[in-house]
């Protein structure tokens, strides 16, 4: 069968394997690429290619991540797999690998383990919207009742963290047997591919979301007015549309009277483009870096939120010492730093470099935010942590 050329016409979906150490996440990743490439075209990735994950930097944090891709008849998948537990924590919190869905791998021989729970909780906190379960190593369990018991346990655990545990797909398989070419177990990988296709909805593209442009710079052009520049985060801005300026100060409304890119005038600016937006009747000192330009009513400013946070270790260039109650670092959202006071959870006295935890923050100025927004924690310009807004509290 001839290899198909890469079709950009297929919808693109981001997924990843999550779950306890040694439950077979990387073996499953290899099995998916091997079986699906044999069935639908594409290229297989061997276990050691995936396991030897390259390091990458996200928000100043080094993370080891393997990226593979594969196709089903209707979709193209980009899939991330991390070698170590700490890499998962960092990956999920920084959003280095934004997942439209997660494949939770649970060994039938062990059932749910501490990291199984931790990854489900993290998935809930950082906003992984859909989870599919692959029960691995089922070839090593002869007792049908035991398999049912493990499946029930996993479903209950997912319910506990507000995933629809009773309804989501659970596939019982063996990644190793599938990788070795055993036809009975290969079928289970095909089944997993079908579950990805049917259970994870097509993600909304950045361009279809409401317009947001984080402001990086402000200029005044004599005779024309004020121009703000930045990279359009999502959506489209058209000349003549009303926009809101949100964050830091009170929200104000204005109209976009021009869009330019590389000194050329355009009718619109789109997600991913670096543009200048001319604002009608807005004075130079009424806008500043750190605010966002947004579709009216689509995003609101907040000061109080709960966050899931990873604190950099000393080796990663983070703090050398723990921090305590009353910690007041800067929180870097999109384009600017805002000081905030940290409220540690009950019973937590201090936080060590390398920890991950949930805490509350009160900023000294409001920032345009929604749940799922990523930020860095900084001290005097140096990154000491990364976080994601898991819940807005005001």
Swiss-Prot record:
Keywords associated with the record: Cytoplasm, Elongation factor, GTP-binding, Hydrolase, Magnesium, Metal-binding, Nucleotide-binding, Protein biosynthesis
Segments of this protein annotated with the region G4: 136-139
NCBIfam families hit by this protein: EF-Tu (TIGR00485), PRK00049.1 (NF000766), PRK12735.1 (NF009372), PRK12736.1 (NF009373), small_GTP (TIGR00231)
UniProt keyword Metal-binding, yes or no: yes
EC annotation from Swiss-Prot or TrEMBL: 3.6.5.3
Binding site for GTP: 19-26, 81-85, 136-139
Coarse class of the protein's main subcellular location: cytoplasm
Subcellular location(s) of the protein: Cytoplasm
GO cellular component terms given for this protein: cytosol
Catalytic activity line of the entry: GTP + H2O = GDP + phosphate + H(+)
Entry protein name: Elongation factor Tu
Key word Ubl conjugation present: no
Binding site for Mg(2+): 26
Annotated spans, G1: 19-26
Cited HAMAP family: EF_Tu_B (MF_00118_B)
InterPro entries: EF-Tu_GTP-bd (IPR041709), EF-Tu_GTPase (IPR050055), EFTu-like_2 (IPR004161), EFTU_2 (IPR033720), G_TR_CS (IPR031157), P-loop_NTPase (IPR027417), Small_GTP-bd (IPR005225), T_Tr_GTP-bd_dom (IPR000795)
Family membership: Belongs to the TRAFAC class translation factor GTPase superfamily. Classic translation factor GTPase family. EF-Tu/EF-1A subfamily.
């Amino acid at each position: 069968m001839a290899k198909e050329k890469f079709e950009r016409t297929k919808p693109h979906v981001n997924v990843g394997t999550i779950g306890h150490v040694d439950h077979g996440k990387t073996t499953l990743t290899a099995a998916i690429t091997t079986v699906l490439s044999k069935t639908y075209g594409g290229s297989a990735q061997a276990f050691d290619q995936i396991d030897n994950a390259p390091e990458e930097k996200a928000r100043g944090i080094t993370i080891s991540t393997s990226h593979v891709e594969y196709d089903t008849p209707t979709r193209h998948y980009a899939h991330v797999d991390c070698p170590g537990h700490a890499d998962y924590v960092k990956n999920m919190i920084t959003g280095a690998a934004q997942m439209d869905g997660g494949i939770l791998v649970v060994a039938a021989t062990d059932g749910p383990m501490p990291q199984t729970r931790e990854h489900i909780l993290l998935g809930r906190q950082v906003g992984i919207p859909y989870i599919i379960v692959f029960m691995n190593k089922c070839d090593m369990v002869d007792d049908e009742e035991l398999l049912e018991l493990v499946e029930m346990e996993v479903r209950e655990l997912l319910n506990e963290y507000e995933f629809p545990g009773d309804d989501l797909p659970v596939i019982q398989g063996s990644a190793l047997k599938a990788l070795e070419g055993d036809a009975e177990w290969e079928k289970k990988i095909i089944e997993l591919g079908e579950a990805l296709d049917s259970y994870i909805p097509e993600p909304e593209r950045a361009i279809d979301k409401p317009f947001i442009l984080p402001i990086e710079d402000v200029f005044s052009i004599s005779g024309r007015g004020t121009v703000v520049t930045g990279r359009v985060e999502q959506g489209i801005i058209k000349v003549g549309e009303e926009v809101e300026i949100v964050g830091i100060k009170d929200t104000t409304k204005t109209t976009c009277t021009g869009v330019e890119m590389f000194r050329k005038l355009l009718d619109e600016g789109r997600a991913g483009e670096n543009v200048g937006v001319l604002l009608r009747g807005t004075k130079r000192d009424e806008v500043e870096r750190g605010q966002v330009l947004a579709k009216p009513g689509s995003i609101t400013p907040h000061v109080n939120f709960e966050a899931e946070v990873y604190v950099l270790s000393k080796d990663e260039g983070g703090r050398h010492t723990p921090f305590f109650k009353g910690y007041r670092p800067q929180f870097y959202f999109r384009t600017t730093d805002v000081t905030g006071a940290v409220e540690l959870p009950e019973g937590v006295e201090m936080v060590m470099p390398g920890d991950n935890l949930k805490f509350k923050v009160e900023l000294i100025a409001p920032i345009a935010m929604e749940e799922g927004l990523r930020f860095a924690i900084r001290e005097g310009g140096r990154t000491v942590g990364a976080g994601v807004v898991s819940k807005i509290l005001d």
